[in-house]
Structure formats: structure tokens, C-alpha cells
A protein has these predicted regions:
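Short, acidic/small-residue loops that bind anionic groups at enzyme active sites
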Residues: 91-115, 123-129, 251-254
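Conserved beta-alpha junction segments in alpha/beta enzyme cores
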Residues: 19-23, 168-201
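N-terminal glycine-rich "phosphate-gripper" loop used for MgATP/nucleotide binding
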Residues: 74-85, 106
Length: 285
């Protein structure tokens, strides 16, 4: 089973870019093959902006409708791209906070996840999105259920600085997180382990985003930082940057965690605790 037995009906949301129809179909087929009921998204009205699935108002309305539907057990994002930050001031967070529902995705979904954390609404879950469900590898597949059940997941990382640290998780795409810095939807990071990933960014831009988050105070009271995948970035330059960054913040730092746009992807919830000790990672609820 991809998802645990308590996830019987999934609501598909498209909060950012539009998913290609063939990927929508293959993802829904993968869910139904597992015996999961799917609330298929009604086509959003045409949007003049090609890289968005619909207007901010229509996308926000779609989320609220499915979030508050008592028959829906989980919200699954169809894909990332760009657009989630546009929705944050449009969502009725007070109303959404009354129902604790998992919302699964990553990448641009960081904007929703961090706002959920800041407004204490729902449960952010990092896991594959609908468009990739039919093509995930076995390691990724086996790790998904643990994000909902709390079952222990383990892997290995490279220690950049320090030996051990532990805390609840705050994870996100680096570029999106930097966009939220200093705004109304920037979450409290006290006692958290910060997990960050990105894709196709030159190292100087990664440094710029890390500097912005550093100056916004994200790392001040955090327990440490774990870097996921940064595919498309120069590995040697990244290693140098991570070392300089660790010296700047004077916190434990690890790199190479399987989280990001590459496979495998280890799924987890913001309610999980992550423990890193001498390069070994254990995640459990």
C-alpha cells in the first residue's frame, strides 16, 4: 500500500502549475490501483497566465473546498511549479485550522506548508506528488506510509559540522522559503531541524537565499540544518558553500539527505522528529 489504511479518499489539488493530462490520468490510476478513492479536481477556469493552473482565487477556493470536506482524508498536490505564495492571503486560515488534514507535496508547496506551520492549520507532509506517483522507485514508495503512521525511516547523510542533533522538522524548497522570509507566513523555527532542497540553481543563488534566511533569523534557534538534493548545482561549489555556511551559523549541519527533486525521496511529516547522529538519520513520530 502506498498510503496507510486510514487514507481511503484523496482530494487532488492544483495550487501552482497545471499538470499535463496524461500525468493526471496516470497518477489517479496509480491511486485507484491501491483501492484509494479519488476526488478528481474539476477543471479550473482558463487562466491567461500559462504557467498557472488557474487564477489565485480559483486555486484557493479549490483548496478550501476539499480541505473542509469531511470525506477527504488527505490533500495531494498534483505538481509544483510556481503559484502557492499567491494563495496565502486568500485562504481562510482560521477556518482551515479547525480541521487537521495532511497536505502532501514539496517544492513550490513549501509556501503552503510553511504557512500551515505558521498558522497551525493541517499537517504538512513531504511526499511525491500526483504527477510522479506512477514512476517512483521502490525505496520512495516504501517510505511514503511512514509519513502518516510515524513508522521509523532511516538513511545516511554526510556530516558537514557537528556530530549529532535532533528536533521536529521544518522542511522546504530553499528559493520558496527565502521568498517567505520576514513575511506573515514565516514559521517559528525554535527547536526545529531545518531541511532544505532546490533544483537547477547556481551556487551563488543558493548562497544568496541562505544568507537571506540567516538574516531573517531562521537558523538562530534551530537545532541544525540538513541539506537535501540540489540537482543541477556544481557539487564541488556546493560542498564549499555548505562548509562556509556551517561556520557562519555555528550549528550542526549535514548534507545528502534524500529529499528533493531526485529519487529516492524519503517522505516525512512536520510532526515527525528527525535525529542525526554520526551520519545516521532516523525519522519517527
Amino acid at each position: 500500500m502506498i498510503y496507510p489504511e486510514n487514507i481511503r479518499k484523496v482530494g487532488i489539488i492544483t495550487p501552482a502549475g497545471r499538470l499535463a493530462p496524461e500525468l493526471m490520468e496516470s497518477g489517479i490510476a496509480a491511486l485507484r490501483k491501491e483501492g484509494i478513492k479519488v476526488d478528481e479536481p474539476a477543471p479550473l477556469p482558463e487562466c491567461k497566465t500559462a504557467y498557472l493552473a488557474g487564477t489565485p482565487e480559483d486555486r484557493a477556493e479549490q483548496i478550501e473546498k476539499l480541505w473542509l470536506d469531511p470525506e477527504i482524508d488527505m490533500l495531494l498536490c498534483s505538481r509544483g511549479g510556481f503559484g502557492c505564495t499567491q494563495l496565502l492571503p486568500l485562504l481562510n486560515w482560521r477556518k482551515l485550522a479547525k480541521r487537521n488534514i495532511p497536505l502532501a507535496g514539496f517544492s513550490d508547496i513549501t509556501a503552503l506548508h510553511w504557512a500551515m506551520s505558521a498558522r497551525r492549520a493541517g499537517t504538512p507532509v513531504i511526499s511525491p506528488m500526483l504527477g510522479k506517483l506512477s514512476s517512483i522507485d521502490e525505496v520512495t514508495r516504501c517510505a511514503i506510509a511512514g509519513a502518516f503512521t510515524g513508522k521509523e525511516r532511516s538513511t545516511a547523510v554526510k556530516m558537514v559540522a557537528g556530530n549529532s542533533f535532533s528536533g521536529k522538522i521544518l522542511a522546504g524548497n530553499l528559493t520558496v522559503a527565502a521568498c517567505l522570509a520576514g513575511g506573515d507566513y514565516f514559521p517559528d523555527s525554535a527547536g526545529k531541524v531545518i531541511l532544505l532542497e532546490d533544483i537547477n540553481e547556481p551556487v551563488y543563488k543558493i548562497d544568496r537565499c541562505l544568507t537571506q534566511l540567516e538574516q531573517a533569523g531562521l537558523f538562530d534557534r534551530a537545532e541544525g540544518v540538513v541539506f537535501g538534493s540540489f540537482s543541477g548545482s556544481d557539487p564541488a561549489e556546493l560542498e564549499e558553500l555548505f562548509n562556509r555556511f556551517a561556520n557562519r551559523i555555528n550549528k550542526p549541519v549535514a548534507a545528502g539527505f534524500p529529499y528533493g527533486h531526485n529519487l529516492p525521496l524519503i517522505s516525512f511529516s512536520f510532526e515527525d522528529t528527525i535525529t542525526i547522529s554520526d551520519g545516521k538519520v532516523v525519522i519517527a513520530h
